[in-house]
Structure formats: structure tokens, C-alpha cells
Amino acid sequence: MSESDSNHLTGRDWLWLGLICSFGLGSVATQMAWVLALLGGYLFWRKGAAVIDPSLRQMWFWLGCLAIPAFCSIFDSTLMDRSVRTLLRMMSFGLVAVVLIQMPPSVTALKKITIGVALAIGFFCLDGIFQKVIGHNIIGNALWSDQFNPTRITGFLGLNYAWVLMVLSPWLFEGCRLVDKRGFAYWVAIPLLFVAVILGGSRASGLLLVISVLSYATLIGVRLGVRASVQFVVPVFASLLGSVVVLSANPELGDRWLAMMGVFPGGAGDAAEILSWRPYLWDAAIALFLEHPINGVGIRAFGVSSESLLANYGVADRIPGAAYNWSPHLSVLEVAADLGAIGLLGYAMLLTTLVRWLINAPMLAIAPGLTALMALFPLGSTLPLFSARVSAVAWISIAAALAFAKVATHSQRQ
């Protein structure tokens, strides 16, 4: 292959780029995961030797950290059929990994894919800001109105606009680093991200932004030196100061962000009404964990199991949606209630070993690896940890990180 040909993305590389960008589209990523799982099952049947691949074994170990506790939880599940379906979906990502790890992108495409995803995230930010300013986004979607926010941004990403941006933010940070070693790209992208998050009004996503920034700054500081970390942190602090000014100047936005204090005792008074039911969900999750300390109430069975408790608390009628879909709105408590102590142990093993792997992984694997950590973050409260959307983002990101690391390591050895 000529040098000019090697500098172009192959068809497989474009599919990789599309797969990662689909993380923002929810059901698209979930459907693609099922297709990849079917293909992975075929490849595993035809090429059983793939099981000796160290990257694939690592993926299956991480899956096992939650899949084994999920299997144990089924025996006491109050919704056995749903628990079984959730477990099967979780295990299907092991077959997805067969495809992604056995068919990775080309080594010359890794940086381009990262930059391409970063550009897509920048577009998503602009689309949401555009929607907030004129009332509809580029393709005509109007602002969403509900009991929590009368003017919620959805853009291309749906109701969880800010959450998607925060989970994918490591791709934006790494893409900026790759495209401009002097750090100027950070000064464009990071303020744009902060504006999108503020306008999105998602307090939980604001916490994810803090964790994403701290994690990325720490990793590049350890791997590339203090100078690289400072190049990243300075525009972050500048954007943070700018955000404070914006919130101070806009009472509507400022009041909404201050309302996050309402989840704590003695918080924001009347402004806490929107969030006043969350502490009861947390109490219910703890109570269910104490009642079923070993293997929990069953994966994805929290809602039905907690319905009587929350009715006794007098808040069941204030929680949106049917009890079937309720979650503790805190990932670590979801694991505790659904999977018990066995699940908490597996969850801790998954997170600690993933962090250790990331510290030593090739730099090109940092973006997908951190994305997985953001999706699995213990204090995540926007979407249920075991929901289809979070599972797809988390496990496909882990498989992508392993595939990127495999390609980068092989290239370094040659």
C-alpha cells in the first residue's frame, strides 16, 4: 500500500468512527451492538482460537465482574424475566468485543478517528446551543418542556443531551490534544463544552464534567508531564470562571444550578421540590440492600421492589414514570440494591482494574477508556447503570479501548 493510501480511512475505519459517534444517538448504538453481537457469535464459532487473545480475555474478565453477580441475583429477583434479559444483553457485549478486538481500525486511523469524534462532539455542542438560542436545533427539533425544565435542550442527542456530552468529553479533550500540541484547541472546545452543559441545566452532568476534567488532567500529567496537564487545566479554569459569570448574570440558569443543593438536608428550600424524591430513592436502595445483602433484589428489579417502601414514604406519586422503570439515581446504590455485596465487590474490582489498566495503556486508548469510566462512574445519577444505553456506551467503549491499545502496542513493537 502506498503512503498516500495509508493516510486515508478505510471502510472499516469509517465504520469505527460511525460506531463511536452513535454513542450519542442512544437506540442506534444499542441496535448496532446487537448486530455486532450476532457477527461476534459467528466469528467465535468459526475462529474459536480468538479466545486466546489477551485483549479479549481482559474484556471477559471485566464483564464477569458484573455478569457473575447479575447471574447470582436472578435467583431472588422480583422481576426474573427482566433480570434474565438484562444479563443476556450484558453478556452479548462479550461477543461484540470479539468483532471489535479482532477487527480493529488501522494504526494510521487511530488519531483521525479520535479527532473525528471530537469534531462530532463539538458539533453536538453547537447544535444544542443553537437550539437554546433560537428555539430549535439545526434539523428543526424544538426545545423539550417537562416538569423539570420548561426549555430543555435535546439537539441530536435527545433528553440526556448533557449526560452524553460529559460521557464523551474525553474524546473532545484528546482530539484537541492531538490536533494542536500547543493547546490552542482547548481554548475553543472547552468553553464550548461548558456553555453547552450550563444551558443543558443538568446538575448531575456538571459533576461528571468535573470528574472527566480531573481524570483526564491527572492521566496526561502522569503520562506526558506537568506541562501537558497545565495546557489543559488553564482553559478549564478560565471556562469555569466564565461559567460563574454567566450563572450570576442569568437568574433562571443560576437558580436551576443552585437547586442541586436541595438533595441535601437544609438545602435550597422550595427550589428542592424537583429533587425532593431522590433521597427517598437512596433510602429505599439502602433498605433493600440491608434486606438482601448477599445477591440483591435482582438486576433491574429495584423499581418494583421499592414501590411499597416509597409508597410508605409518601413520595411514590411524585416520582416520574412507572415503578417498573425507577432506579436509585446513584450508580453505586443501584449496584448495591440490585446485586448485593457480591455486586459491590465485582463493581469495585471492575473500576480499580480498569483504572490501573488505563494508567499503563497507550495514549490512544485513553479516550475510550475514560468514556467507559464516565459511564460507569459510581455517583452517576442521570440514567440507570444497567440500562441499555449506559451498557452500550460503557462496554463498547471498553472494547474500543482494548482494540485501540492492541493496535497501538503492535505498531510500537514493529
Residue ranges with predicted function:
Residues 1-85, 95-115, 119, 176-184, ...:
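Transmembrane signal-anchor hairpin modules in multi-pass inner-membrane enzymes, especially those
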Residues 11-19, 189, 326-330, 348-350, ...:
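Loop-to-helix entry and N-terminal half of a specific, functionally important transmembrane alpha helix
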Residues 13-18, 141-156, 276, 318-333:
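Juxtamembrane membrane-water interface segments that cap and precede transmembrane helices
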Residues 20, 95, 111-142, 148, ...:
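Alpha-helical transmembrane segments of multi-pass inner-membrane proteins
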Residues 27-46, 87-97, 160-169, 207-214, ...:
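Membrane-embedded alpha-helical segments of multi-pass membrane proteins
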Residues 36-42, 209, 213-214, 241, ...:
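Transmembrane alpha-helices of multi-pass inner-membrane enzymes
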Residues 126, 130, 199, 220-269, ...:
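A membrane-periplasm/extracellular boundary helix in multi-pass inner-membrane enzymes
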Residues 268-283, 291, 295-339:
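Long extracytoplasmic/lumenal interhelical loops at the membrane interface
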